[in-house]
Amino acid sequence: MPDWYKKWQNVSHIYKLPASFPKMTAKEFVENFKLEKDSLLKEFTNIESHTEVQNLIQSMKLNEEQSKILKQILSSTLRDTFYTILLGLDGCSAIGKSQELYEIKDENGNLISGEIEGYAYEYFHEME
């Protein structure tokens, strides 16, 4: 048995994970995608960030009105991308050339897919 494993065994009791994690729902799954979309938009449009996207935006030297329009373009692009991916995973839209239902499960093996479409519409169109 390697030394690193012996050391890990001695402290593994400190990092006990619960026997089972709470079931993730389709709603929570979609919420996480929405949070990611919002986070990316904030990062892309934050003058202080050093992302490639922000660097390219800065290089265009846009005025305030142009920056506002670009932010709307980025938001719409991210919204449509995330929404299409979610619908594709739920079998309601094609991903590339294929349209099929994918089984998405949480860490406990509970099925998440099958109810994504409705929540995706709610979070990416009704709440926008």
Enumerate the language-model features and the residues they cover.
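Amphipathic protein-protein interaction modules
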Residues: 64-116
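Generic alpha-helical propensity signal that fires on short helical segments
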Residues: 42, 47, 51, 80, ...
